[in-house]
């Protein structure tokens, strides 16, 4: 679990977002360390709790709220030989040219080389004439 700040309109439990890095106004903000310093660029986060504290913000239409976030489970296509629920693997993205499957082939929030735990196998999928599995995974170093 990580403490960070998000715009007041976004501050609802269950909301997911991708952190792309600090915006220009953030670089001179006194809250930048709490707001952006705890997040990793390119990662997906899910708000699990909204706290009652709020602060002024130049970027988020006036206010940000203190929230608790986690990296959520993410669906990704993997090789069938690695598809064992409960196992840990080093993520390697499969070769797939189908633009409709890009969100499963290279999902935002995961990077090739991440160590992930396979939570469950969701189903089968085919691409480029090959059969793969869709797995729900979570980055292993987020499991505390």
Curated annotation (Swiss-Prot):
InterPro entries cross-referenced by the UniProt entry: UPF0179
Disulfide bridge map: none
Protein family (similarity comment): Belongs to the UPF0179 family.
HAMAP family assigned to the protein according to its UniProt record, in alphabetical order: UPF0179
Protein name as catalogued: UPF0179 protein PF1381
Source organism per UniProt: Pyrococcus furiosus (strain ATCC 43587 / DSM 3638 / JCM 8422 / Vc1)
Lineage of the species this protein comes from: Archaea, Methanobacteriati, Methanobacteriota, Thermococci, Thermococcales
């Amino acid at each position: 679990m990580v403490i960070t700040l998000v715009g007041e309109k976004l501050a609802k439990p269950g909301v997911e977002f991708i952190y792309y890095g600090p915006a220009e106004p953030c670089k001179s903000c006194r809250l930048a360390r709490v707001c952006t310093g705890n997040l990793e660029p390119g990662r997906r986060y899910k708000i699990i709790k909204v706290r009652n504290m709020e602060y002024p913000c130049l970027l988020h239409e006036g206010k940000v709220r203190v929230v608790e976030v986690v990296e959520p489970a993410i669906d990704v296509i993997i090789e069938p030989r690695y598809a064992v629920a409960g196992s840990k693997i080093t993520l390697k993205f499969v070769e797939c040219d189908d633009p409709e499957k890009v969100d499963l082939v290279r999902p935002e929030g995961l990077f090739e080389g991440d160590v992930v735990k396979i939570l469950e196998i969701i189903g089968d999928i085919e691409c480029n004439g090959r059969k793969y599995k869709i797995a729900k995974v979570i980055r292993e170093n987020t499991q505390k």
